[in-house]
Amino acid sequence: MNDSNSLLITRLAAQILSRNMQTVDVIVDDKTLSLEEKIDTLTSMVLAVNSPPQSPPRVTSSDLAASIIKNNSKMVGNDFEMRYNVLRMAVVFVKHYPKYYNETTAGLVAEIESNLLQYQNYVNQGNYQNIEGYDSLLNKAEECYVKIDRLFKESIKKIMDDTEAFEREQEAERLRAEQTAANALLERRAQTSADDVVNRADANIPTAFSDPLPGPSAPRYMYESSESDTYMETARRTAEHYTDQDKDYNAAYTADEYNSLVKTVLLRLIEKALATLKNRLHITTIDQLKKFRDYLNSDADAGEFQIFLNQEDCVILKNLSNLASKFFNVRCVADTLEVMLEALRNNIELVQPESDAVRRIVIKMTQEIKDSSTPLYNIAMYKSDYDAIKNKNIKTLFDLYNDRLPINFLDTSATSPVRKTSGKRSAEDDLLPTRSSKRANRPEINVISSEDEQEDDDVEDVDYEKESKRRKLEDEDFLKLKALEFSKDIVNEKLQKIIVVTDGMKRLYEYCNCKNSLETLPSAANYGSLLKRLNLYNLDHIEMNVNFYELLFPLTLYNDNDNSDKTLSHQLVNYIFLASNYFQNCAKNFNYMRETFNVFGPFKQIDFMVMFVIKFNFLCDMRNFAKLIDELVPNKQPNMRIHSVLVMRDKIVKLAFSNLQFQTFSKKDKSRNTKHLQRLIMLMNANYNVI
């Protein structure tokens, strides 16, 4: 009985001190051990808690740490891992607290990260002979955090001791809370009015404005008005007096080759710039600095990396650019369209505060323009939307695009649409009616001044209803106008091109079993031979989105010969729904198709191959449907009923594919020329200039 009590007491003590319940239970339940052996084993576990560590564990798992440390207990492994994880959490906390992540703390944070990186690399090498080296790295990191903590406490104490400063801080907190509430209210109102936005012209234009909107709950850009005016003013003054200095800069700059000191100084300067100048630097520079920081932490070869900093920011970051250019390929250049799009692609939250039309255009740019070889497309937008852009980087993007291909700016107050920096207009454009010219033929609306608006709310309501109706009429006319412009080409030729190009792909039919059905997913078994054939070519010319509107627009130019017989209209509408459901189903099961198709590989460009099969299967089916109506005579204007259905389904298809994340690939080996696939790929991208 006494021995049983001793075992229970020893078991309880071992569970409390070692905190390893599972191991203690295994020892107690082991029937091969006697009672005394169990007590001795548990006692040794308790005594091992205070034993000195012989080697450090890996930082990724406590179980793995205990297995790789020689003659050590799990308690020691837990201690190392706990200290490491606490420091990692501390770094994340400080970086996400912008009020205290300033020039001083940025340097300390960089030192902590440098010590943790050295510690992790040292542990993963598997050399455990010098335990003092491990402990010294963690101690250095902990000392830096103690300094940060002391700075926090001093700033809090200073505020608490100064009554006026404390009141100002409380007022700033109140302003931040009010701003947050106001932003939430605006988002709720925007969500409530989402149905009205669908009926507006800028939401229905099926060219530049056809991309889906990000959800209202998407994070807003942190550089905008989420912080109080007091904090923003402080950040502005800090940026004006910024000094690009570091205590070890001279020693690092005089180094003959890249070493750990140069790396540490560069990381400190980068963190300092990102923490202090986030409102002043161009987004391209910020994006490049983040990539540079990640590259430095990866310890890759210095000769394989290059960055492009904005030439204006290089003046501010003189020391950083000079030191980096000594060991890396660093260039100070003017922003280009491709570099700006890459930066916005990585910081898409920048576009959140902008208007709906601007967001759609920017998102479409980031999705479709991959590099300098990608052809640009025509963009039309209201001049008022351009003038209302809040973020300077977004406005710079439009300016860069306009320099390459003039944007068609629609002036709501003038008599004709205007192009920025270009006064040329074709004679064909002069013959087309504009939204503003149609507005000029309508009776004018009396504009109520702000004083009258306050005096008479009833008049305001009446005028608002009139204005809303007027805008809807204008939008409908403008939508018809854009559709008419798009239908200038003879639709018979477009359908004929689909038939000719797809019939010419007999070599591809030999490698697959094309079911010509949109009711099911393309099967990997039916396309296995085709996938192996496609792997020989570079397929990066395939657009990773679906130009649903452009592909099916030719169908909108057909009407029923007899108004009483709606058979043809029903067939066209049903086919549009069938095609949209097919693409939605493919987008929903894209990951599944990727896995099943890759069984025949593996393939480096699997995502492009899946998209090729999705579009190829669709073109096979549309070829058969086009033959049914190819002999009919099309109209010069679209059937608005069918056109409205197409616009609606286009938005749904775009939304389905915009939520996908695709894998890029780098194909360095030589690939075959895709010349005989060029026409088919152009047709997949809705480019009818194939013949």
From Swiss-Prot:
The keyword Transmembrane does not apply. One of its GO terms (biological process) is exit of virus from host cell nucleus by nuclear egress. GO terms for cellular component: host cell nucleus; viral capsid; virion component. InterPro entries: Nucleo_P80/P87. GO terms for molecular function: DNA binding; protein homodimerization activity. Residues 450-464 have a biased composition (Acidic residues). Its main location: host cell. Residues 416-466 are annotated as: Disordered. It is found in: Host nucleus; Virion. Keywords: Capsid protein, DNA-binding, Host nucleus, Virion. The keyword DNA-binding applies. It comes from the Viruses. Structural protein that plays a role in the packaging of nucleocapsids and in their egress from the nucleus toward the cell periphery. Homodimer. Interacts with host nuclear F-actin. This is Capsid-associated protein VP80. The gene is VP80.
